[in-house]
């Protein structure tokens, strides 16, 4: 895996920014997205382009293995690496689908009010899934319960009925880029806000909403 891959992202002004990654760097990006998604309480920004590039890379690796000499130890090693990558990829996608099913009305509402140029939390396929899941949930509620209730009770507000992601939950993180003057909210009413500096390589247990922007920017890694 030595070829170079192009990955399109967004710069700070919302424009297109092209990143050139080696396959090893691409897999590292996938693993970072997987760990962040696994430990974040909310659905994070969609990494659809990384997923697409990884799937293309897996197909390319499969083709190379088909042409390789059978019985070669390298073939077995590359096959194991492919299975590891497939596991990470499928686990990442399953984690996102579970969050969509758990928080779908809030995710769709966030998508509705998202400003132009702001990264989406959903890939196009995930958006379709979330919409269909909400439609099926509403239909199920109507058929099972709501149609048997008085007319004034035959509507359900899913935004109120479905719990929101708990952004006050605590997460472990490792600092990748030094951060200064991070405002930390007090845990008790009698305490005051205070600021901390995050040094590269240091690990912390901290409330998620305090460092959510740093997770999005890649300055910290959830662990």
UniProtKB/Swiss-Prot annotation:
It is found in: Nucleus; Chromosome; Cytoplasm. Highly abundant in testis. Weakly expressed in thymus and bone marrow. One of its GO terms (cellular component) is CMG complex. Pfam families: Sld5 (PF05916), SLD5_C (PF16922). SUPFAM superfamilies: GINS helical bundle-like, PriA/YqbF domain. The modification N-acetylthreonine is found at residue 2. Residues 166-223 are annotated as: Important for GINS complex assembly. GO terms for biological process: DNA-templated DNA replication; inner cell mass cell proliferation. Gene3D superfamilies: 1.20.58.1030, 3.40.5.60. Keywords: Acetylation, Chromosome, Cytoplasm, DNA replication, Nucleus, Phosphoprotein. CDD domains: GINS_A_Sld5 (cd11711), GINS_B_Sld5 (cd21692). The modification Phosphoserine is found at residues 12, 16. The modification N-acetylmethionine is found at residue 1. Its main location: nucleus. Belongs to the GINS4/SLD5 family. Required for initiation of chromosomal DNA replication. Core component of CDC45-MCM-GINS (CMG) helicase, the molecular machine that unwinds template DNA during replication, and around which the replisome is built. Component of the CMG helicase complex, a hexameric ring of related MCM2-7 subunits stabilized by CDC45 and the tetrameric GINS complex. Associated with ORC2. Interacts with HELB. This is DNA replication complex GINS protein SLD5. It comes from Mus musculus.
């Amino acid at each position: 895996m030595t070829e170079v891959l192009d990955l399109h992202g967004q710069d700070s002004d919302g424009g297109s920014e092209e990143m050139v990654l080696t396959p090893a760097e691409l897999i590292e990006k996938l693993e970072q997205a997987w760990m962040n998604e696994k430990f974040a309480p909310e659905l994070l920004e969609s990494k659809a382009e990384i997923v697409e590039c990884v799937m293309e890379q897996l197909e390319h690796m499969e083709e190379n293995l088909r042409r390789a000499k059978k019985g070669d130890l390298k073939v077995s090693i590359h096959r194991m690496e492919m299975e590891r990558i497939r596991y990470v990829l499928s686990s990442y996608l399953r984690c996102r689908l579970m969050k969509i099913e758990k928080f779908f009305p809030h995710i769709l509402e966030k998508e509705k009010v998202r400003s132009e140029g702001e990264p989406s939390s959903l890939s196009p396929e995930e958006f379709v899934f979330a919409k269909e899941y909400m439609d099926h949930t509403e239909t199920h509620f109507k058929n099972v319960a709501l149609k048997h209730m008085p007319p004034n009770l035959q509507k359900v507000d899913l935004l109120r009925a479905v719990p929101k992601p708990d952004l006050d939950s605590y997460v472990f993180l490792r600092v990748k880029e030094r951060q200064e003057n991070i405002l930390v909210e007090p845990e008790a009413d009698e305490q005051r806000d205070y600021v901390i500096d995050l040094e590269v390589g240091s690990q912390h247990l901290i409330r998620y909403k305090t460092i959510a922007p740093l997770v999005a920017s890649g300055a910290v890694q959830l662990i």
